[in-house]
Amino acid sequence: MKYIYTVFLLVTIVACKSNLEEIKPTLVTEKTPHDTDDPAIWINKKNPEESIIFGTDKDEVNGGVYAFDLDGKIILEKSLTKVSYPNNVDVEYGFVLNDSTTTDILVFTEREKHQIRVYSIPDMKPLDKGGFQVFEDENNVEMKRPMGVSIYKNPENGNISAIVSRKSGPSDGYLYQYAFVSDSLGVHSNLIRKFGKFSGEKEIEAIVVDDALGFVYYSDESVGIRKYHASPKKGNAEISIFGGEHFKRDIEGIAIATYQGDRGFLIVSDQQDHSFNFFSRSTNSFVKKLNLGTLETDGCDVTTEALGSKYPNGLFVSMNDEQDFFFHALDSLKIAK
């Protein structure tokens, strides 16, 4: 009976896929053991062909953040396992340690331990003494469970902070922002602000930061995409909410394809339509919808930088609800700069 139900469910999902012409992936990664959710692209500046795609795999006991090479193969020695429900992941470049050396970092939410984790890349060493607790001032356990995370590097001073969302939260102050600082005692995480409105419907998971333009966007899943200033110094007032009318139901993962100046696109998963909506980076106006073949996409990431001969003009990565991730050469999306 369970087999029949599973087949019925898969047939139903396929039948409900977007009727847009499908753009086939360049490749599909190896499968993870449990439940994929969110990817992040780390660019190896010295050798782009050795760049790594990190992807979360959710499980309360044996979850992981898996590292993939550009052929979609799992790199076991760079993967983190036995993680308690890793949800979303992001990367940043040039975090300054106490001795003035710098390292790239990987940050992910560990939902069941109510914390975020910080690792150096590419050596994959923990910098957080086991994790930084988040939403500590909340009494409700549900409001302590982190989901989304995105990193902001202030282009003016190089300071790095993480913006974190959660499974449940209030109508205002849903997101917390934590600054990462390093001193002789190690790396620390300091709460610097609470901000962000919530409709009260569904939840907030997906977050993305446009470092260069100084904005943070997040998906209030049932109503629209909310936009704020990424720097606390510019205040907590909402700039806009947009795009909700272009989604079938859940508004999910967000990625930003950045080109020179303010050109580029916000790419947002329309989860139940199994498609992606594109919005102008400069005006946030709707541009187009694409079907990239994925099912029930949660998270996605994109880079417009060249990653060797296979992805000379960039790469788009999206989670697929079959324990894997899809890689699309950015050329195949046919988005004009």
PLM features: what roles do these ranges have?
Residues 26-64:
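Beta-strand-rich domains and repeat architectures in extracellular enzymes and scaffolds
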Residues 29-33, 79-82, 137-142, 195-201, ...:
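Surface loop/turn motifs at the tips and blade-to-blade linkers of beta-strand repeat domains
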Residues 35-49, 87-102, 145-160, 201-214, ...:
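Structural signature of eukaryotic scaffold interfaces centered on beta-propeller domains
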Residues 44-46, 70-73, 95-97, 118-128, ...:
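Short loop/turn segments immediately following beta-strands, especially the blade-tip
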Residues 70-114:
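Blade-loop segments of beta-propeller domains
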Residues 112-159, 165:
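Asp-box/WD-like beta-propeller blade repeats and closely related beta-sheet repeat scaffolds
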Residues 241-253, 283-307:
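Conserved blade-ending motifs and adjacent loop-strand segments that build the rim/top face
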Residues 246-286:
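Loop/turn-rich, solvent-exposed surfaces of beta-rich toroidal or solenoidal domains
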